[in-house]
Amino acid sequence: MNILNTYEKLEELGRVRLSKNFFMRDFLYSEIAAWHGIRNIPENPERAIHTGRMLCENLLEPLQSTFGRIHIRSGYRSPQVNEYGNHHNLNCASNEKNFGRHIWDYPDAQGRCGAMACIVVPWLVDYMEKGGSWTALAWWIHDHLPYSSLHFFSKLGAFNIGWHEQPERRIDSFAAPKGCLTQRGMSNHGGSHADQYKGFPAFLSAPTAEPSQSVYVASPVKFAPVSELSAPTTKPAASPSPIGVSFPLAVAPQVRASN
C-alpha cells in the first residue's frame, strides 16, 4: 500500500482522476481540518480512490450531466477529522457510522465498501426558491440512480448522497417534511414516482473518462483484507487557529496552486 508520507505523494493523490469531471483533490478539503489543523488524508489511498470513483461515476456525474454543475460541500473525511467533528458537535456521526460513508478508505462493520459526499445542486436551490420541494429531486434520484442513502438538510437543499456496494436505498431528511421519506418495506418504495418531479430535465447518462495512471491505483485494484488494515489513527487535534493565520499547505492542499 502506498502510504502518503511526503507532500509530493499528496499532490500525486490529488491529481488522480475519479471520473470525467472529478479529481480526488475535489474531495479532500475540510473546514474542520483547515480550522483545527488536522490532516485530512486517506490512510488507505487505493481504497479511497476506488470508492470515490464509484461515487463519482454512478451518482455525481449523472447528476451533473442532468442538472448542471454541482457543488461539493464535504467529501472524504479522515478518521481523525471525523472523530474530532463528532466529539465537538460539528455535525459528524461517529467513526463507526461513517466507515463506508464519509470515511471512504475504511469499510463498514460488515466489511463492505462505500463513499459519501455532501453536495449542493444549484438547480435545486433555484427550484426550491420558486416553491419546489427537495422531495422532487429525492424521488428523481430514487428512480434513476443506484444510490445507497440520501439525507437532506435545511440549508441550500444540501444533501448527503452515498454509494455502497450493498445499497440501502433509504431517504431521510432534517428539512421539512422531516423524517424518513422512503426505505425498503415502505409502500412508496417501489414503482415510478415520475408524478413527483414533473418538468425535470431529461436524464442524461454520465460521461466516461480514461482511468488515471497513478502509483496509487493498481490494475486491477486489489485491496488488503479488512483484517490487515491498520486501526485508524485518532491523534488529538491541535487547538483552533485564529482567523488570519495561514494554515500549513499539508493541511489544506487546495490553497496551493499546482499543475
Where do the PLM segments sit?
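N-terminal, Lys/Arg- and Ser/Thr-rich interaction peptides
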Residues: N2-N44
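Proteins with a high burden of low-complexity, intrinsically disordered sequence enriched in S/T/G/P/A and R
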Residues: S19-R25, E43-A48, M54-E57, N188, ...
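Generic secondary-structure transition motif, activating predominantly at the C-termini of alpha-helices
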Residues: G14-R17, I32, N89, H142-L145, ...
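Catalytic cores and adjacent binding grooves of peptidoglycan-active enzymes
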Residues: I103-N259
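Cell-envelope/glycan interface and biosynthesis
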Residues: Y29-H142
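A broad, structure-centric signal for solvent-exposed, well-ordered loop/edge residues
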Residues: R17, R25, P79, D126-M128, ...
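Internal hydrophobic scaffold segments of catalytic domains
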Residues: M1-E12, S65-G68, A252-Q254
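Short linear sequence motifs
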Residues: R15-V16, K20-F22, L28, R69, ...
